[in-house]
């Protein structure tokens, strides 16, 4: 073999080797790009899910619309029952009241009440305070449904547009036949997830009606 032929063969072998290395580099780059694209898509989906969950966590919660008290109309009668009207916050996810707690503070005592049962009053024909006459114990609250467009509250779940009253018997909780005049009461309805609905008021100087607007 002449020197010229040897050099030509050597150049040919080098060219094939370079081509193989180049193809290998292209394949590695393609695999790496595919991994990066898949990882990027996964991270994007995870970030979107996390962002949605965070938004729901921030937006979720309860709003207290008002508080009414009940006394039987006799002289020196105290507020023996109380109804706390609540609705989900705007943008809130569904709230499960069966896993919610009611905190009520009065006269240095804080009582924690759990869900008892639910009564449908959406027809508007019932006295809201009659809902408590189902034997609700002092450690539990009763839910009276006032507005429910999708029948979700039957299972104790409220969502957008629902309005319920959380009814308790203060005379059983605090004794002394309930809460007298000029007394401070505070509390919150704490859902399992989200912000609580907070209430705070002072009872009137005199009780002139059976149903009293407290907040």
Curated annotation (Swiss-Prot):
Function: Flagellin is the subunit protein which polymerizes to form the filaments of archaeal flagella.
Gene Ontology BP terms: archaeal or bacterial-type flagellum-dependent cell motility
InterPro entries xref list: Flagellin/pilin_N_arc (IPR013373), Flagellin_arc (IPR002774)
Keyword Membrane in record: no
Native organism taxonomy: Archaea, Methanobacteriati, Methanobacteriota, Methanomada group, Methanococci
The protein's name in its UniProt record: Flagellin B1
Subcellular location, principal: other
Annotated organism of origin: Methanococcus vannielii (strain ATCC 35089 / DSM 1224 / JCM 13029 / OCM 148 / SB)
Cellular component, GO annotation: archaeal-type flagellum
Keywords, comma-separated and alphabetical: Archaeal flagellum
Domain of life: Archaea
A molecular function (GO) term: structural molecule activity
Residue stretch(es) of the prosequence: 1-12
Compartment(s): Archaeal flagellum
PANTHER family: FLAGELLIN B1
This protein's record includes keyword Glycoprotein: no
Sequence similarity: Belongs to the archaeal flagellin family.
